[in-house]
Every structure is written in C-alpha cells, then in structure tokens.
Design a protein with these regions (language model features):
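N-terminal assembly/attachment segments of tailed bacteriophage virion structural proteins
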Residues: 56-57, 61-66, 70-73, 80-92, ...
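Short, surface-exposed secondary-structure edge patches
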Residues: 106-113, 201, 373-379
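Short amphipathic beta-strand and strand-loop transition segments with alternating hydrophobic
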Residues: 77-89, 137-145, 400-406
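Well-ordered beta-strand positions in beta-sheet-rich domains
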Residues: 69, 130-135, 153, 323, ...
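Oligomerization/assembly interface segments of phage tail-like spikes and tubes
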Residues: 83, 87-107, 149-162, 223, ...
C-alpha cells in the first residue's frame, strides 16, 4: 500500500456550500441566456426570441428557486481553518473564525451557483460532525495562461463576523442600576435575533449599566471579561457564551513531547512547540476601563467611565514590562480594582507552552491510526481542556485557538494554549447574594 492509497483526508472530509439548484432552465448571462444572443433589431439565425424556442418562459427558473447543499470537495487542493479566541494576559476575546479554500479550474463558482454570503461547511463524513460552519465572504477566480491553470479561492467567516458587524448602543436593565450577568448577555443578543447562541456556564456576577456605543462583539467581550469567561463560535455555527471555561475534559487529549503513553484516550505527540519568554512581554501594569453610566440631573443616562489601575513595581523596575488594557462592566470600583489586581497576579513571568502542532495524517502516521486521529482532531473546540507534557512536566491548559491545514493527503493541526491556572475570577463572585 502506497502513501497515496492509504487513508487520507480526501476520503473522509466533505466541503459543501448552499447553491441554487442547477436545472436545464435558463440562467442569467449563461449559456442560452447569454446577453450576446439576445433579440436585436435585425434578428440573425439562432437568436433567442422572447417566449419562443429556447427562451420559452416555461423553461425559466422561478423566483422561488430552491437551494441545496452541494459537494465541492473534488477540485479542492488546500483547505485551511482557524477558530477560537485571542488573549491579552488572562483575558480572552472572540476572534472571527475563517475558512480558506484553494481549488482547481474544475470548480467554477458561477456555473455551480456559488454566491457571496452563501452558507458553507466542512464536515467529517465518518462521524457526521462539522469542522467549520460559516458563510462565504469572498470568491476569487484567477485565470491562467491555459484554462486548466485557472485558480479559484473561496474565503469564509463564522458567526463572530456577523456579531462584530452589529452596532450596539449601550445596555441597562429596565429598572434599577445593576443586572445579572446572564440577563445582560441575553439583552445584548437581542440585537442579533437571527444568531443562534448558548450559555453553557453562567455567573452570579452583576454588571453595570452602560451607554457605550460599540460593536455587539465588543459588548460581549466586556461582559465575559468581567467574569473571566469567553465566547466563541462552535463548529455548528452557534455562539457559545461562557462565564468560565469548561472544567472537565471533553476529548480526553494529552499533548506530549515524548513517545510515552499518558493514560489518556488520545495521546498526541506534538512535533513543534512554542514556549518563548521576553522581558518586554511581562505585564507590570493593568488598566481596566469600566464602561459605566449614570443619570444626569435631567435623568438622562450618560457615560461615567473610569479606569482601575494595578501596578507591580518590582516587575516594572526589573523588567520594564508592558501594560495590559481591557474593557469591563464591573459593578463597582471595588470589584474593578480587585479585577485589575487579580489580572496582574495571574500574569506569568515564566515561559509556558503557548502553541503546539501535530499531524493527524502524514507519511509518518500509521494507516490504521489515521481515521481515529482525524475524527478526534475535527472535534477539537476552543476552550477545551487538555493536558500538556513538556520535558516530563505536566500541566493543564485551555485551547484558545485551533487551526487545521488540510490537503487531499495530509492534515496538520496547530493549537494555541493558555495555562488553566491563569483563568477566572472565582474569588470575586462567590454566590447569588454577593454584593461586591
């Protein structure tokens, strides 16, 4: 058995888009409805005549033409996916997930009915699970010297991009000043009625009113930052808005730099790890901007922002360091000050494994392992908890982003990580009666 006949991504993955149902009916500016063949004052032989012959209205596509999921995997030569969050210290911000497809000339987007904004998904046919779900943001066709040299590129984004495009003009409860964290999240999501979302973990925290005019994504970032949580788009295209990251293993994965077994169901031997340390990256100052609001003398709500500052003089003197700036909705100055101090304490001054890469499929992976490895890799989500082993030392980390680089014959996955111990503000919001 050669490498090219062994189990490979092309056997297991399917890329699909929602496209118009292709029939033998006439389609705008294509084939029989090509504008160059329209009626003219002098009608040459073979010209289309309205409601006659090939232009008979009975053969037109109706305005309510159906669409369906269409498989476009065949011509694809490279697929890359990236989903997850970005980090600033211990704070996580949602990042738009992307899918990029490169394909050969056999994929003609116009002929296939593929349009800007159409839904697109990459899924694993073995377990039926999606790896990415989103919508097309760009289609590019680059003609070559020969027709067969034409290159097609399709770009797509996930639901985070839609949320980032929505402007939200503040948020406050119907009565009173503070409101429950989950109530605020649901209030914010009222600005995106067609976006599916879930709240897998909630918080007892209260948040302040705000008149902050910014994107809905920035409001969600501030809400989750206030409780040490995060939000992201999952593989099905649904937003997951979490007060805190998962505390249990989902995929039972261990990432190790050795070839020893770890006791985990899936032991991934990573081939490349990033664990760098630079003095200028040490956080020596935290500035937490609270986007508060209060009524003026006329009863109109106005911005009452303030900044909570925490400084570590020893770090600043020894290393110089950097300033971490975040947006929050803390309910009081006391909580804001405590948050800033907590983030400063959580800032690491030692190197940790921040990224690893491994291969579900390559020439070095045994054929009988490939299907299971592809199944597991495709299920990885941001915030998943994993065990990381480096030079014999074990630690727990949350995945902050997952990237897949896939060809018909190979699959490389890269994960970025954040140590578990630097996440969360459990000490600030302790119960439903907490008033701090």
């Amino acid at each position: 058995m050669t490498f090219y006949t062994q189990t490979k991504p092309a056997d297991q993955l399917k890329l699909e888009v929602v496209a118009a149902v292709v029939t033998d009916a006439m389609r705008w500016d294509i084939d029989r409805w090509d504008r160059s063949r329209w009626d003219r004052e002098e009608v040459p032989a073979g010209t289309l005549i309205f409601n006659a012959g090939m232009w008979n209205r009975e053969k037109w596509i109706e305005e309510t033409a159906l669409t369906k999921w269409v498989d476009i995997t065949g011509p694809c030569t490279h697929i890359s996916v990236k989903r997850g969050v970005t980090t600033a210290g211990s704070i996580m911000y949602a990042h738009t997930g992307t899918l990029s497809v490169k394909a050969a000339a056999e994929l003609d987007p116009r002929a296939a009915g593929i349009l800007y904004g159409a839904q697109i998904r990459l899924k694993n046919t073995r377990n039926g699970q999606p790896i990415f779900t989103g919508f097309i943001t760009d289609i590019k066709v680059e003609p070559g010297k020969k027709a067969s040299d034409t290159a097609v590129t399709i770009e797509a984004a996930d639901t985070v991009a839609k949320v980032a495009s929505i402007t939200r003009y503040g948020a406050r409860p119907d009565g009173g000043r503070l409101e429950n964290w989950e109530s605020r999240v649901r209030r914010l999501m009222g600005s995106a009625p067609n976006v599916a979302y879930e709240i897998p973990s909630t918080s007892y925290a209260l948040v302040c009113p705000t008149v902050w005019e910014t994107s809905l994504a920035a409001h969600l970032d501030a809400a989750t930052a206030t409780v040490g949580g995060a939000w992201y788009c999952d593989r099905q295209g649904t937003l997951q808005i979490c007060a805190y990251p998962p505390q249990q293993y989902k995929t039972n994965v261990a990432l190790t730099d050795s070839y020893e077994r770890t006791g985990k169901i899936d032991t991934w031997h990573y081939t490349d790890a990033k664990a760098t340390w630079q003095a200028e990256n040490i956080v020596s100052r935290v500035e937490a901007t609270v986007h508060d609001a209060a009524p003026n003398d006329s009863g109109e709500w106005r911005a009452a922002d303030y900044v909570a500052v925490a400084v570590e003089p020893t770090r600043a003197t020894a290393w110089g360091g950097s300033t971490l700036k975040i947006d929050t909705l803390a309910p009081s100055r006391f909580i804001a000050d405590e948050m800033a101090q907590t983030m400063l304490k959580e800032a690491l001054d030692y190197p940790t494994v921040s990224a690893v890469a491994f291969w579900p499929v390559s020439q070095r992976i045994d054929n009988d392992q490939r299907q299971d490895r592809m199944n597991t890799a495709g299920l990885i989500d941001p915030l998943d908890l994993v065990e990381v082993i480096r030079d014999g030392d074990k630690s727990l980390a949350h995945i902050t982003s997952v990237s897949h680089d896939i060809t018909p014959y190979t699959w490389k996955t890269t994960l970025t990580l954040l140590p578990k111990e630097v996440i969360g503000f459990e000490n600030l919001f302790t119960g439903p009666n907490s008033t701090r």
